[in-house]
Amino acid sequence: MVAKTLYGLEDVLATELTALEAEEVTVGRRMVSFRGDKRMLYLANLRLRTALRILKPVITFHAKTTDEIYERLRLFDWTTVISSDQTFSIDSVVYSDSFKNSQYISYRTKDALVDFFRDREGKRPSVRLSNPDILLNIHVSHEEVTLSLDSSGESLHKRGYRVAETTAPLNEVLAAGILLKAGWDGNTDLIDPMCGSGTFLIEAALIACNIAPGIYRRGFAFQRWADFDPDLYDELFHDDSAERVFDHIIYGSDILPQAVAAARSNVERAGLGRYISLSVLPMQQRPKPESKAMLVMNPPYGERIKVEDMQQLYTMIGERLKHNYAGCSAWILAFKPEHFNHIGLRQSHREKLMNGALECELRGYELFEGRRDSFAERKSRRAEGEQGVGRRIDRRDVSAGREKRSNSMDRENKPPYRSPRPDKPFRTSDNRKKEHNDEQQRETRWPNDRFRSSDESERGPRKSSSKRIQVIRNDE
């Protein structure tokens, strides 16, 4: 089977499938393949938080043209997946240089199905784009074609608890994936200071209480399959043995009253009001949390929700995180790199995620008092400081001894300096001044004396020297 997901959530989905005890879990591009029975198929639809669809492959073959696809599907026994009285729709996904038009592949698949039933029974199933009985999926990778049954029907991100929404609501699968990547397990409080219609809040409560996200849905496509087992499904649907108690609080706030009203309606529909506290409050006015908490937020990008000054918004976020949430962790989904630059904090986690058609980034921050230093660095500096105290004491002892030695030498009674050369007399301050004046007079009379031989000194300066200097000046 195949579980489809959003770009960047494949690793989280694989972890979820492993926890469900699925076999042969393999990560692919926006999908994770696995093996399992009918029970696993039902569980995957009910309990996976980061899956969009669960597909059950029925036939795989190779083809180079759309005509080959038609011929192979024309020979397939369609009665194993659909009857002539049912409705259907076809979704196609293509990753191939040989096939450019995914919609045309859907048309050719429909032709093969209709021609099969018309030749066999004289009647054909009807196409219904909205809520069909059977949803088919054609996946083309290079020249490999796979026909699958879509067991989910509507995308699994449509949980069923959303009865109200705001502009640009966050995808439920994406929200759950971000929380799982952040390591949310319900062991602390959680805060969303820009909660919108409450997607993060509800998904966080479902994870904390380990409530299956699929219990709010009206149904799944596999319930209309010929081999549907209602007893098995009812057993799994009503099994709440894995649910747990959540002892913390999830706080949600927003500056817009209508957003908080929408969030409250959705929270009530999900039956999670006892875990979630809502308020109309800008982020600047949120009080400091009483204990360690996790912050998660999806601020406006400036695309669909217009904000007058994006730089000011994200700068404010960074300032509030730094000064109000020390000891907490924060996870932010944003669209443009400059948004994070305005936050001005060093991230501990960074990766790309898709929010609809927008390529966004998720960044995580560990918030510390003052500078962002790791505990190991702080411990190292503390140890060095303790050792430095001992070193400073030693230096003070040495300095104190040096000061005593300096004071013990009376400069006024110090004997005159005696040159190590035997032909030099004792030097007093008057002698040193006289020697210095004589040296200056010699330098004035013969500036080049020190560079001349003894013969030249007797004759005086060379006459050609001034000419040589003049030539040099002319050349310059």
Model-identified regions with their sequence ranges:
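Non-catalytic nucleic-acid substrate-recognition regions in nucleic-acid-modifying enzymes
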Residues: M1-P132, R392, D475
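Short, charged/polar, Gly/Pro-enriched secondary-structure boundary elements
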Residues: R39-L46, E154-H157, R371
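A short, flexible beta-alpha/helix-coil linker loop
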Residues: Y95-S98, E154-S155, P300-R304
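SAM-dependent Rossmann-like transferase core, predominantly class I methyltransferases
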Residues: L147-K181
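Conserved S-adenosyl-L-methionine
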Residues: L170-K288, E303, Q311-L313
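C-terminal catalytic and target-recognition region of SAM-dependent MTase-like enzymes
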Residues: L281-D397
